């Protein structure tokens, strides 16, 4: 049934309208309630349809946030498996982050020279990212479709990246809710939750990782005897975060077009490590 809906959506794909004023790189277009879903001719139609449905479902409970993203001209670009982050016209000139960039993880800061400093700008971004948030949010077709070349197999990276956009809308359009998200993040740091995990890096990553678990679409996180894999686990482990996620997404925990929803691939084979945080 879900595949049939995606295939039906795919038949609505057309060339981008001239009014969008996009680069000729973009040959395909779907409209997600005013948020353009774009790609080159190389991306499969079904991947655009999946991105469309995920956007619609993540914003369903908050039309005000949807309206803000439309007003700010947010758009989504789906990369084909053979395309890279810097193939996208808006990202061709991206440079590497500096060693002082607050978005770097502690391991990236510790090993900056080896992991980042020795690479060209293009080498860094093409190795680092198969999806980015922002006014142009990108997604990888192979991840949206859980394909064989998916380097992030086991989690939906687009759910994570679009969650950043949702938080940007909250920050601008619902200051009270954003204050609650920020307070939850400060509380979680003080309580030493998510220690060493990507969620501890910034309030933005805290929200995006939490969103993945809210929608049962993130790789398992382990903290000794505590495991976080589902929305139920998340609510138990970080109730303050769960309350704010509910305020944005309602009680929905399943994005129908998400291939990794409740997937066994979210748990790696073999014995689980005591802690999934990177050791550096």
Where does each model-flagged region fall?
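Sec-dependent N-terminal signal peptides
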Residues: 2-12
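Short amphipathic alpha-helical segments with coiled-coil-like heptad repeat character
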Residues: 3, 65, 216-219
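Acidic/His-rich structured neighborhood in mature extracellular/periplasmic domains
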Residues: 25, 32-35, 44-186, 224-227
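Short N-terminal segments immediately surrounding and downstream of signal-peptide cleavage
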Residues: 16-31
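A very general structural signal that marks isolated residues within well-ordered alpha-helical segments
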Residues: 6-7, 61, 214
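Intrinsic disorder/low-complexity segments
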Residues: 10, 14, 121-124
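Metalloprotease/metallohydrolase-associated module, dominated by Zn2+-dependent proteases
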Residues: 21-24, 38, 94-103, 110-140, ...
């Amino acid at each position: 049934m879900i595949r049939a809906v995606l295939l039906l959506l795919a038949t609505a794909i057309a060339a981008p309208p001239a009014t969008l004023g996009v680069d000729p790189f973009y040959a395909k277009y779907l409209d997600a309630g005013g948020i353009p879903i774009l790609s080159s001719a190389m991306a499969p139609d079904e991947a655009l349809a999946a991105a469309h449905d995920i956007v619609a479902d993540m914003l369903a409970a908050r039309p005000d946030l949807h309206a803000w993203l439309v007003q700010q001209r947010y758009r989504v670009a789906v990369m084909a498996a053979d395309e890279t982050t810097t193939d996208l016209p808006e990202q061709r000139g991206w440079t590497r982050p500096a060693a002082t960039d607050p978005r770097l993880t502690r391991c990236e800061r510790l090993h900056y020279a080896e992991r980042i400093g020795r690479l060209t700008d293009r080498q860094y971004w093409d190795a680092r990212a198969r999806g980015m948030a922002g006014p142009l949010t990108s997604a990888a077709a192979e991840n949206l479709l859980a394909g064989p070349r998916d380097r992030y197999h086991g989690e939906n990276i687009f759910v994570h990246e679009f969650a950043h956009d949702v938080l940007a809308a909250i920050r601008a359009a619902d200051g009270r809710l954003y204050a609650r998200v920020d307070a939850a993040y400060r509380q979680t740091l003080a309580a030493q939750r998510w220690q060493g995990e990507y969620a501890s890096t910034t309030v933005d990553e805290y929200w995006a990782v939490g969103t993945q678990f809210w929608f049962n679409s993130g790789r398992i996180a382990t903290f000794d005897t505590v495991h976080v894999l589902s929305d139920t686990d998340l609510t138990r482990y970080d109730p303050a975060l769960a309350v704010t996620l509910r305020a944005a997404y309602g009680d929905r925990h399943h994005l129908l077009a998400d291939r990794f929803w409740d997937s066994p691939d979210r748990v790696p084979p073999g014995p689980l490590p005591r802690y999934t945080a990177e050791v550096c």
